[in-house]
Amino acid sequence: KRVKFVKKLEKDSLLSADIFINCSPLGSNLKKKYLKKSPLTTDQFQNINKNILIFDIVYKPKRTKLSYQCKNFSIKYVNGLKMNSFQALKALMIISKVYRNYGK
């Protein structure tokens, strides 16, 4: 698969994307200035692959501006709590394997 990391999206960048991962603090409650922000504009949502999955690392608050935008444009969205859970599960699997093999 082809992976592309970008700092700034061009107008039509999301037309061919299958997944968009928000790794910015925009939408989070880390600072007041981030809270009501989104990494994507309404114009970008109008030029987006309708089958894209948007994965947001933000999990506080649970509902962000990005999540509402996705809902309004019928875009699949997963918030940061799920990503955090996936990471915790993977870490648990790794550490469990280490402990099982420790005494051998």
Residue ranges and their predicted role:
Residues 102-104:
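A short, charged, Gly/Pro-tolerant segment at domain boundaries
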Residues 59-62, 75-99:
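Active-site capping/gating segments
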Residues 2-77:
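Rossmann-like adenosine-cofactor binding region
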